[in-house]
């Protein structure tokens, strides 16, 4: 399953996350019960779940009213947190909750220049924040999202100034800025705080990676969590869940046109780029300006390696410009090496590179070294060995499927 958290319009807060997860299908009464029980260790809170509208859109709103606000040191906070033992919470949930608060504590320590054990929780130590985190974590596991591929879109952070325990600070708050380090953010669409430290810490601990756009998926359910304000735009956090259509990842595509390089230099560039970590390199003949023949060099690389590959491309080609296409979606089948026996002048073992979509074999190619070995042993031309081997593999796989037996001669 694939889940996308969408905070690009109204940001993310703790109660918005809980509301969106409940709206997606988490148990509302049990979630509220967990929240109130957790808050009781920090002064207590009342939790209510209701359906509201924000700028005309329906959403679930979770209202948490704390009886009092605690201001505690991080170590004392952890001690109080250890006292939470609701029967609906297991060790994995409690571990994730601790990770969320640790994320906040690390951010606070960084922005204030203190050690972790010197961090003092103010707003985050309040019962409502504890309720939000425990409720969000419970709902997350209640929906089994911990087994999904979870992504986030860019986070709207708002703007202006916000008053906290340390007086006025710019939006996003320093702790929020630290928590969202490495994640794409956008300002606005209003001059208020839209991304809170609690909501941001939940987000970064829930997601696998960030994306600018939705991944390929078949949408099955959507949940909307409302914020407390009702401005002119929909103040909601959206969570979308569905099934992945094809296994996929994202890569960066680099390309440039050259018309001044010899075949020897182009061959060397090809090898150097692959050695530098490029996933694939292609050279395509093109006609350039003034009808000059040239080459289009295309390089596919991992997103976190494109700058290094880009440097190699500039230095090796001497080109003055490279087109960069970030976040290119690429369908990728699961790849596996399987062994099978083939009958080519006797029974012989060969390895096949197999592409799988789920449990279904979509593609199979004999490994070149094994095909060459069989060709040398039998005197049969290589292309015939490849054709015969792959046909036998397909027949063997078909027979195994018919017998509903996963082995069928395949290892």
From Swiss-Prot:
Q: Superkingdom, according to UniProt?
A: Archaea
**What one GO molecular function would you report for this record?**
nickel cation binding
**Which Gene3D superfamilies does the record match to this protein?**
mk0293 like domain, Transcriptional regulatory protein pf0864 domain like
InterPro entries attached to this UniProt entry: Ni_insertion
Q: Which UniProt keywords apply?
A: Nickel
Read off the HAMAP family from this record.
LarC (MF_01074)
- Can you tell me which family this protein belongs to? Belongs to the LarC family.
Q: What is this protein's name?
A: Putative nickel insertion protein
Provide the species name. Answer: Methanothermobacter thermautotrophicus (strain ATCC 29096 / DSM 1053 / JCM 10044 / NBRC 100330 / Delta H) (Methanobacterium thermoautotrophicum)
């Amino acid at each position: 399953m694939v889940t996308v958290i969408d905070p690009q319009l109204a940001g993310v807060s703790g109660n918005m996350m809980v509301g969106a997860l409940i709206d997606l299908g988490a148990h509302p009464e049990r979630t509220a019960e967990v929240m109130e029980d957790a808050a009781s260790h920090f002064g207590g809170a009342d939790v209510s779940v209701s359906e509201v509208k924000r700028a005309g859109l329906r959403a679930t709103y979770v209202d948490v009213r704390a009886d009092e606000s605690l201001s505690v040191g991080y170590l004392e906070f952890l001690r109080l947190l250890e006292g939470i033992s609701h029967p609906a919470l297991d060790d994995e949930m409690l571990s994730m909750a601790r990770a969320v608060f640790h994320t906040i504590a690390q951010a606070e320590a960084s922005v204030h220049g203190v050690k972790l054990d010197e961090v003092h929780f103010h707003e985050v130590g309040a019962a409502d924040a504890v309720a939000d985190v425990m409720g969000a974590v419970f709902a997350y596991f209640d929906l089994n999202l911990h087994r999904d591929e979870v992504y986030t879109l860019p986070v709207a952070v708002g703007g202006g100034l916000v008053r906290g325990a340390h007086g006025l600070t710019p939006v996003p708050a320093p702790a929020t800025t630290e928590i969202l380090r490495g994640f794409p953010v956008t300002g606005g669409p209003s001059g208020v705080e839209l991304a809170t430290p609690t909501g941001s810490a939940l987000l970064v601990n829930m997601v696998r990676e960030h994306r600018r756009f939705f991944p390929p998926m078949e949408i099955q359910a959507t949940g909307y969590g409302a914020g407390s304000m009702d401005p002119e735009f929909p103040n909601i956090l959206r969570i979308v869940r569905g099934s992945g259509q094809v296994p996929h990842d994202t890569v960066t595509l680099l390309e440039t046109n050259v018309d001044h390089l010899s075949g020897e230099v182009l061959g060397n560039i090809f090898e150097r780029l692959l050695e530098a970590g490029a996933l694939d390199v292609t050279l395509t003949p093109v006609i350039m300006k003034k009808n000059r023949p040239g080459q289009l060099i295309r390089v596919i690389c991992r997103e976190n390696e494109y700058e290094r590959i880009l440097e190699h491309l500039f230095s090796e080609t001497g080109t003055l410009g490279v087109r960069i296409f970030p976040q290119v979606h690429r369908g990728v089948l699961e790849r596996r090496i399987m062994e099978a026996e083939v009958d080519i002048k006797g029974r012989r073992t060969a390895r096949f590179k197999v592409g799988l979509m789920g449990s279904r074999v979509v593609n199979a190619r004999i490994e070149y070294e094994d095909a060459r070995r069989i060709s040398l042993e039998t005197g049969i031309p290589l292309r015939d060995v490849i054709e015969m081997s792959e046909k036998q593999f397909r027949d063997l796989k078909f027979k195994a499927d018919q017998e509903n037996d996963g082995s069928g001669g395949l290892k």
